[in-house]
């Protein structure tokens, strides 16, 4: 038993020693591994299953720029937040499922810097930790990106270059070309492999091309101009550079089509020739001068304008001829300095001392450090313009100050201009009248007849009249005459408003007629009244003394005598009105009394009279019996023009605060325009047995009341009398009338 125990202790000691040796060896190996891990360039660290960093080497600290103590507080996910969350979660799941993950990912450091790393994570079976190896591949990524960019840049340059780029072999066979080359050579890209550069070299240029090829083989590059002939027969000229052994021993050529350039150069040469011809033979003075103002070149016309020979002119400065005292000179100078071009007119003093007004245009930098000025003598034109302006001013004063309306119009009758009086006469503004045609005022027939050579109008005898309706609705009467072609395509129409004059003449004519009628009426009335009194007396005596049934005869005689008596009364009213007493009365009551008086006569003719009163009608200052006489005259006429019956509409309303309007409308046969104009004239009547005195008396009564009668009529539709009366009459005017 003791022996067994001793053996066991001995074995234990041996085992312990062995374990110590093994432990020392493992520590040694661990230290060696630790040294290797710490000195490796890759970041190596261990994480638990919560992704927290447990242990890391020094390379990890350097790569992540975090010390070891802080690293142990961090999760590896803290550095992977630049990866989209969904993608990161998917990668973590895949790692825990397979135990292995390799990925190239960007990481974001605490300082904000970004690095690209190669990330390797691996976990052992059944282990509750995993290790991660990270390698910084930022430089590699930068190189890859630069290479990719350079490759893409070359491809873009190759594909998008304006110049043609072609790769070909030592025999001239095409390998590849960009779109510009194919377009210039009029070939498709898929044809390139079957074509050679030699096929496009014209036989006359083969020797030159061989020399280019020799220079290329000798120097490794060549440049120059190469004429080619396309398959379509079109000839082009190309500017080229060729480099040998550019890619896999091939040649690369950059070719630019300069056919148009050469053509433009030729055109430019011809243009310069033409400019020289124009410069030397121009009627205007042309001067080229330098920045210091010195004249560099001038044509012969410049010598003539500046009154100097060429050799002296080329020794002068352009500013030497300008008159400094003129105000426009300094303004023109500043404008030219600012804009580099100008068009102006200035006063110049010529070489012989003469002053001339010159119109000029100047432009800077048409040539290097040079300026171009073209000058024209406008002294005569200026003088003519001044005379023309003075003439225009005189014409405008006469035109605008004329006592008649003047209108200028072209051969299509479009109004070009009108003076203020024409605008006033026609009731249109100056702008409005210019938008009209003369045909809007006068018919084409009248224009052609009045302005024809066979009938020249004397402006002092303007006896041609036309009616004209203003936009306000007023009717005017105009006298007019014309003058054709006062200048080319310009005619003159002269208007004079004679409305007031014609109305005055008409009033004078009627006044004279009324005066004569009044005197005649007074004489007739006095001469007839006395015999009439005797006749009435004897008829009454005779009626009482004669036996038999003669009542019908006496009634007829008495009725006719009463009619003669009413005519005598109207004569006396025309001759000299009796003393009139004006008083305030309601015109509505006067009208009602009149309608009541005439109702019996109206009923006999089957005529209905309707009175319509609108709003409150104020009383007016009037002589009621006279107004009643007016209403009787008009209503009786209305009844008589409707023998088959009809309606009379009477409307009374306040026109405004100071006037009352009475309208009497019938449904008779109406009147023509000519008849309307003569209403109120003595002895003018439209009735078979009328005297024409009733309406004349009515007009006179309304005139004495300071009112107005207006008549509207249309044949077949009836007539309307509009009577306007003032609420208060002007006492001064009434005294003058009396």
Curated annotation (Swiss-Prot):
Keywords: ATP-binding, Kinase, Nucleotide-binding, Phosphoprotein, Repeat, Sporulation, Transferase, Two-component regulatory system. Its EC number is 2.7.13.3. The lineage of its organism: Bacteria, Bacillati, Bacillota, Bacilli, Bacillales. The keyword Repeat applies. GO terms for biological process: sporulation resulting in formation of a cellular spore. The keyword Cell division does not apply. It catalyses: ATP + protein L-histidine = ADP + protein N-phospho-L-histidine. The modification Phosphohistidine is found at residue 526. Gene3D superfamilies: 1.10.287.130, Histidine kinase-like ATPase, C-terminal domain, PAS domain. It is an enzyme of class 2 (transferase). Residues 29-99, 150-220, 271-342, 391-462 form the PAS domain. GO terms for molecular function: ATP binding; phosphorelay sensor kinase activity. This is Sporulation kinase E. Pfam families: HATPase_c (PF02518), HisKA (PF00512), PAS_4 (PF08448), PAS_8 (PF13188), PAS_9 (PF13426).
């Amino acid at each position: 038993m003791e022996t067994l125990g001793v053996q066991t202790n001995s074995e234990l000691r041996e085992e312990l020693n062995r374990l110590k040796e093994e432990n020392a060896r493992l520590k040694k190996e661990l230290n060696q591994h630790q040294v290797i891990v710490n000195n490796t360039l890759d970041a190596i660290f261990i994480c638990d299953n919560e992704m927290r960093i447990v242990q890391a080497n020094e390379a990890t600290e350097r790569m992540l720029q975090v010390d070891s103590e802080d690293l142990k507080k961090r999760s590896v996910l803290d550095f992977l937040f630049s990866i989209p969350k969904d993608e990161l979660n998917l990668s973590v799941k895949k790692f825990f499922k397979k135990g292995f993950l390799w990925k190239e990912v960007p990481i974001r450091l605490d300082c904000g810097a970004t690095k690209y790393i190669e990330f390797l994570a691996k976990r052992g079976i059944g282990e509750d930790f995993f290790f991660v190896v990270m390698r910084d591949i930022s430089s590699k990524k930068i190189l890859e990106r630069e290479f990719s960019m350079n490759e893409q840049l070359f491809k873009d340059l190759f594909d998008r270059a304006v110049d043609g780029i072609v790769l070909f072999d030592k025999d001239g066979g095409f390998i590849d070309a960009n779109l510009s080359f194919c377009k210039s050579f009029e070939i498709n890209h898929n044809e390139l492999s079957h074509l050679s550069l030699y096929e496009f070299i014209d036989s006359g240029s083969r020797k030159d091309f061989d020399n280019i090829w020799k220079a290329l083989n000798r120097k490794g590059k060549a440049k120059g101009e190469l004429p080619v002939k396309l398959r379509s027969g079109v000839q082009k000229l190309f500017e080229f550079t060729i480099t040998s052994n550019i890619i896999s021993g091939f040649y690369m050529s950059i070719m630019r089509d300069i056919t148009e350039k050469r053509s433009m150069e030729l055109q430019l040469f011809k243009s310069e020739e033409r400019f020289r011809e124009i410069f030397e033979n121009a009627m205007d003075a042309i001067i080229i001068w330098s920045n210091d103002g010195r004249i560099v070149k001038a044509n012969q016309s410049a010598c003539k304008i500046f009154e100097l020979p060429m050799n002296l002119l080329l020794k002068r400065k352009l500013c030497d001829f300008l008159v400094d005292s003129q105000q426009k000179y300094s303004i023109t100078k500043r404008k030219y300095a600012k804009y580099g071009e100008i068009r102006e007119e200035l006063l110049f003093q010529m070489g012989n001392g003469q002053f001339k007004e010159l119109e000029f245009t100047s432009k800077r930098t048409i040539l290097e450090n040079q300026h171009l000025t073209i000058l024209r003598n406008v002294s005569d034109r200026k003088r003519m313009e001044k005379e023309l302006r003075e003439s225009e001013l005189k014409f405008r004063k006469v035109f605008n100050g004329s006592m008649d309306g003047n209108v200028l119009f072209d051969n299509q009758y479009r109004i070009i201009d009108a003076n203020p009086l024409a605008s006033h006469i026609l009731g249109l503004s100056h702008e409005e009248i210019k938008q009209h045609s003369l045909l809007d005022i006068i018919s084409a027939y009248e224009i052609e007849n009045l302005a024809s050579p066979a009938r020249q109008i004397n402006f002092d005898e303007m006896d041609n009249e036309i009616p004209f309706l203003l936009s306000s609705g007023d009717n005017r009467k105009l006298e007019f005459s014309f003058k054709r072609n006062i200048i080319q395509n310009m005619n003159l129409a002269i208007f004079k408003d004679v409305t007031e004059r014609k109305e005055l003449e008409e009033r004078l004519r009627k006044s004279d007629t009324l005066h004569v009628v009044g005197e005649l009426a007074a004489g007739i009335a006095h001469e007839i009244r006395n015999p009439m009194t005797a006749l009435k007396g004897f008829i009454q005596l005779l009626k009482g003394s004669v036996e038999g049934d003669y009542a019908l005869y006496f009634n007829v005689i008495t009725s006719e005598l009463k009619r003669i008596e009413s005519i005598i009364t109207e004569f006396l009213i025309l001759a000299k009105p009796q003393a009139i007493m004006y008083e305030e009365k309601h015109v509505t009551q006067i009208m009602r009394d009149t309608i009541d008086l005439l109702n019996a006569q109206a009923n006999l003719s089957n005529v209905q009279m309707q009175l319509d009163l609108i709003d409150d009608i104020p009383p007016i200052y009037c002589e009621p019996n006279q107004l009643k006489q007016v209403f009787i005259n008009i209503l009786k006429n209305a009844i008589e023009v409707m023998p088959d019956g009809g309606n009379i509409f009477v409307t009374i309303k306040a026109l405004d605060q100071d006037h009352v309007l009475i309208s009497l409308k019938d449904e008779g046969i109406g009147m023509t325009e000519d008849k309307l104009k003569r209403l109120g004239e003595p002895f003018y009547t439209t009735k078979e047995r009328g005297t024409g005195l009733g309406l004349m008396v009515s007009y006179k009564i309304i005139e004495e009341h300071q009112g107005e009668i207006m008549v509207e009529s249309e044949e077949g539709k009836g007539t309307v009398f509009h009577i306007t009366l003032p609420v208060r009459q002007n006492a001064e005017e009434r005294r003058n009338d009396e």
